[in-house]
Each structure stands twice: as C-alpha cells, then as structure tokens.
C-alpha cells in the first residue's frame, strides 16, 4: 500500500492515470487478486515507484523506505510484462495504463527500447479500437472512467512528443487527428464520481481562463505546450528535409510553412505570462500532497517551456553567442526549480536537459575561435554543476564527470595553442592569460576578460577531436 500512496505523491501530479479514491479503494479491497488486468496495472505501478525509490526520488521523511528496497524494481517490472502477455489484443483501460506506466518505468531504468515497445503496444491498442476518438470509447463507461481515459490519453500524447524530441523518434499521435477532450478541471478527485462532478466550478475549458485554484488547470496548460511543440517539431524536421530533398510538397503546401519561429515564441510567451502566479514559480516542497501538486505543475511547465524554446531556437539559424545564451538560460531555469521536485520527477525531467545538445550540437560541427569555445565551455560547466546536484537520480557521477573531463581537454588544448600561436596584440603582456585550472568550488569561467571577442588567428578542431564523444542526452542510469 505504501508504494501506491507514494505513487500519488510523486508520480500522479505529472501522470494522473487514476481517479485516486477509486484506485485506493480497489487496492485496499485487494481487487487485484481476482482481476488480472487490475493486477497488471498495480504491479506496473509498483515497478515504477520502486525504481523512483531506488533512485532517491522520494525525499519525504514520513516514509520508511528501507522495507521498500527489499524487492528490486526489476521483479515488479518483469512480472508486469509477463502479465501483459495475456492481453495482447485487449484495450481495457487497465491494460492501456499498464503499458503507459511501464513505458515511464523503462525511461527510469534507461531501457529506451522497452519504452518504445510499451508505447508501441499502447498506440497499437488505441489504433485497433479507434480510441483517439471519444465516440469509439466503450459504451456505458461512467464519468470517472471517462475522466481517467482523458487523462491517460493526453498524458501519453505528451510522452509521445517528449520521446520524439529527446530520442529523435517519430510522432505516433497527432493532436490534429485526436478527438478527445481535456480532463475536467476539478480541484480534487473527491469532487467527481460516476454521477458527474460535484465541483461548483463546472467551467468548460474552451471558455475559461487558467485557474489558480486547480492544479489540473496547470496540467492542461502543459498539454497545450506539447501541442505547440508537436507543430514546432514537425516544422523543424520539415525544414531539414526540404534542405536535403526537392520535395513537391513544399510548393503544394507552402502556406503551412509561413509562420515564423519568432511569432510562435511570442505567442507562447504570452500564454505563459497569462498563467496564474502559482504555475510560474516553484515554491519549496511542503510534503502536503495537495499543495505540492501546484509545485509539480510549475516545475513541469518550466521544463516543458524551456524544451519548446530549444526546439523553436534550433529551427532558426543563430550565432554561437545566441545559442550559448539560450542554453545558459535553460540551465538557469532548471536550477531555479527546488531540488526536491527535480528528484521526484526524476529521470524523465532530466532528459529535457539533453535538449541543450540540440542547440550546441551543431556548434561543434563548425571550426570555432577561442572566444566561441569559451562560451561553450561556460555552458558545459553550468550543466555539470546542475547534474552534479542531481547525481543521486542516476546513481553515478558519469554525466557531470564526463562534461568536466571534456572541459579539461578543451582547457589543455587552448593552453597549448596559446603557446604555439599567440595572438599578435594582446598576449605579450605579462600575466595576460590566467591560470586555466578550475579553482576549488568555483564554476565561473577562468579566461580573462581581455580576450577579444573576435576571430582569433587559430581555430579549435572541429567536431570529434574534443567533444565528439560527449553524449548530450546523457546516460543517466
């Protein structure tokens, strides 16, 4: 029962797959012992939460975590996969939820092929019964299950777009082809039952503004951001394809490509600025589940907004200075989120940081001057510091250590170049170049301000020699 309660504390605010009172009641009555699909989804939930506990995501001191370490997450995970073999053609909500939860658990465990397998199974079952349209949902389902299905559908929609951004996969679920309403914005699950909603605010989402008293209002805004992200991502990939192929579709649908990156960015910024304050600032975690759900939305909005900025930015040509500036802003945005939320949301949130490679990756394909590499170096050190603060999530120091190792290689190369090819004007003065080693505990750049921001007489090697083996999406497991 502890694993179920922890789920509603640290996973449910991002993936509200269940109507909490209903599922708690089912588990407390041990209904999973007599209904196999309920057993499958319950074991899948245990696999995900157990993995979060293993990775240090649960920071609430009220939980006695030691007994929960006794069963490894892999035991739950493998059992859930085994149970789902009995439901290869069944699209009940529990089977769909089980695949969805195992996909998230696979991300937690660094099993990206498994993630695609479970997302693929989910999308196959949805396609078989046309569940992208509410008109095809089972007849006679109550209000509660309808709300659960809406939450599940849009949760996996966002996960599909997220996985496409982070791992470069295809988009399997298009919002344009989906006919599923957003979840009702009720303050608490206790306010809904199969007779409907008891909320005094039955406002249609299409006509109401964002509400500061309802965490699901922030959750629905995140879905809005992912819908924008889908179109931005499609446009970005389309522009790359047009650059390499002479597609007849370009001329046929030219009007589809006239929206500018800046206009989209401005529109999204206005959407963000219109949010209630509770969704724009992430307060310290209180360990009051109902209050903290607002903090989870604020943290996830920050991360998703930055991911969208990265994709929009990558779609337009920009200077190295601009790219480093936006990358620093992304790191700073993550650093503004209290650590407890980053730990709780865990590995899926951290993969957003890999998007910085979308910005900086192309930089490394160009021959760079010293000033440009200094900018890249600054971003890398900021990234290393942020990852270092979160090492507990991935149980190793590989990510931040690899970045620092690459920075050291850059420093060594630059130091050698300074002795081989000194710039004619500035470096003759004694002490013009400061010590390149990093001071203890400091993350600031160690190059002097006197380095001119112009092209130097020498360039650093192109992609491969110094930074080619840096994995921007980071192996966090």
Residue ranges and their predicted role:
Residues 104, 162, 309-311, 316, ...:
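Residue-level recognition of tetratricopeptide repeat
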Residues 225:
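Active-site-proximal loop/helix segment associated with metal-binding centers of metalloenzymes
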Residues 23-29, 220, 296-298, 303-305:
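Short gly/pro-enriched beta-turn/loop segments at secondary-structure junctions
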Residues 41-42, 46, 94-95, 99, ...:
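TPR repeat positional signature
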Residues 86, 90-91, 231-235, 241, ...:
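Fungal C-terminal regulatory tails
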Residues 2-216, 230-255, 266-293, 325-342, ...:
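Acidic, Ser/Thr-rich, low-complexity intrinsically disordered regions in fungal proteins
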Residues 108, 166, 306, 313-320, ...:
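Alpha-helix C-terminal capping/termination sites
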Residues 287-297, 309-312:
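Long, well-ordered mid-to-C-terminal structural blocks that present hydrophobic/aromatic surfaces
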């Amino acid at each position: 029962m502890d694993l179920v309660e922890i789920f509603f504390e640290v996973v449910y605010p991002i993936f509200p797959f269940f109507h909490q009172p209903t599922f708690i009641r089912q588990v407390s009555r041990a209904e999973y012992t007599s209904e196999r699909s309920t057993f499958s989804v319950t074991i899948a939930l245990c696999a995900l939460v157990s993995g979060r506990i293993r990775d240090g995501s649960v920071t609430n001191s009220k939980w006695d975590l030691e007994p929960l370490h006794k069963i490894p997450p892999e035991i739950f995970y493998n059992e859930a996969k085994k149970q789902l073999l009995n439901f290869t053609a069944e699209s009940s909500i529990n089977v769909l939820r089980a695949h969805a939860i195992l996909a998230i658990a696979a991300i937690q465990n660094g099993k990206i092929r498994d993630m695609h397998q479970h997302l693929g199974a989910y999308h196959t079952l949805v396609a078989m019964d046309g569940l992208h349209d509410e008109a095809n949902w089972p007849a006679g389902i109550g209000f509660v299950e309808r709300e659960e299905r809406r939450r599940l559908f849009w949760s996996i929609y966002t996960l599909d777009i997220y996985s496409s951004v982070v791992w470069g996969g295809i988009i399997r679920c298009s919002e344009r082809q989906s006919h599923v309403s957003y979840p009702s914005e009720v303050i608490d699950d206790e306010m809904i039952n199969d007779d409907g909603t008891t909320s005094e605010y039955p406002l249609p989402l299409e006509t109401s503004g964002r509400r500061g008293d309802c965490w699901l209002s922030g959750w629905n805004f995140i879905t809005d951001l992912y819908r924008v992200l889908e179109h931005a991502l499609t446009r970005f990939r389309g522009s790359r394809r047009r650059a390499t192929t002479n597609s007849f579709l370009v001329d046929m649908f030219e009007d589809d490509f006239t929206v500018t990156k800046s206009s989209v960015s401005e529109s999204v910024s206005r959407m963000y600025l219109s949010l209630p304050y509770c969704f724009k600032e992430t307060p310290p975690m209180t360990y009051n589940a109902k209050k903290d759900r607002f903090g989870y939305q604020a943290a996830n909005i920050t991360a998703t907004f930055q991911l969208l900025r990265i994709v929009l930015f990558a779609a337009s040509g920009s200077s190295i200075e601009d790219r480093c500036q936006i990358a620093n802003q992304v790191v700073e945005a993550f650093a503004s989120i209290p650590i407890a939320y980053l730990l709780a949301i865990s590995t899926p949130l951290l993969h957003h940081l890999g998007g910085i490679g979308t910005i900086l990756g192309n930089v490394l394909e160009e021959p760079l001057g010293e000033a440009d590499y200094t900018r890249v170096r600054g971003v890398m050190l900021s990234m290393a510091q942020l990852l270092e603060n979160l090492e507990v999530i991935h149980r190793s120091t590989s990510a931040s250590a690899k970045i620092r190792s690459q920075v050291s290689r850059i420093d060594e190369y630059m130091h050698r170049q300074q002795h081989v090819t000194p710039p004619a004007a500035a470096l003759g003065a004694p002490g013009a170049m400061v010590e390149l080693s990093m001071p203890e505990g400091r993350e600031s750049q160690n190059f002097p301000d006197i380095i001119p921001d112009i092209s130097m007489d020498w360039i650093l090697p192109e992609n491969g020699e110094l930074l080619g083996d840096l994995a921007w999406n980071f192996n966090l497991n």
